[in-house]
């Protein structure tokens, strides 16, 4: 008898979000692409508009994904056998870490509803709004608390 686990997961994946960003970025003129890349300040800029948000994922998404997957592999397996966890993400950006976490959990047959809540902290209101949108899409059962806070606050 075959057993198919009933895994609650998002129909979205980070790979699909990344591909949409790349598809948006690719047809831009070389000048537009370079201007956006310059605006990103090597990934350290305070992003203020949708174009910058899209460019950031297109430019840096794969790098973040690789680092995050490596880190998630280091999570002790006993963590996944507890009563659920809270994720605190200081400098959450657009929620790349949360999206990659969802993909990682799905690859390990761990229900997304295992994450009870998220505390998202980010200085950029635009980033934070997009992060909340993605966390809601990827973790529909989780509670979300947000803090829009600058480094000096």
Question: Model regions: which residues?
Answer:
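N-terminal auxiliary segments of SAM/dcSAM-dependent transferases
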Residues: 1-40
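Class I SAM-dependent methyltransferase Rossmann-like catalytic core
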Residues: 45-78
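Active-site catalytic pocket residues across diverse enzymes, especially alpha/beta-hydrolases
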Residues: 75, 79, 105-109, 135, ...
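Conserved class I S-adenosyl-L-methionine
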Residues: 83-93
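Conserved SAM-binding loop of SAM-dependent methyltransferases across substrates and taxa
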Residues: 94-111
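Short beta-strand element of Class I
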Residues: 116-119
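Conserved SAM/SAH-binding beta-strand->alpha-helix loop
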Residues: 124
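S-adenosyl-L-methionine
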Residues: 129-153
């Amino acid at each position: 008898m075959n057993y198919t686990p009933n895994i609650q997961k998002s129909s979205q994946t980070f790979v699909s979000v990344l591909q949409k960003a790349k598809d948006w970025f690719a047809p831009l003129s070389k000048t537009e692409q370079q201007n956006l890349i310059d605006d990103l300040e090597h990934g350290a800029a305070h992003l203020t508009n949708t174009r910058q948000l899209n460019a950031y994922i297109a430019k840096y998404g794969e790098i973040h994904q690789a680092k995050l997957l490596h880190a998630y592999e280091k999570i002790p397996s006993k963590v996944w056998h507890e009563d659920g966890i809270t994720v605190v993400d200081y400098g959450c950006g657009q929620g790349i870490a949360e999206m990659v976490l969802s993909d990682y959990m799905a690859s390990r047959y761990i229900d997304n509803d295992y994450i009870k809540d998220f505390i998202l902290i980010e200085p950029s209101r635009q980033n934070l709004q997009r992060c909340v949108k993605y966390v809601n899409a990827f973790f529909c059962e989780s509670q979300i608390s947000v803090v829009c806070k600058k480094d000096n606050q």
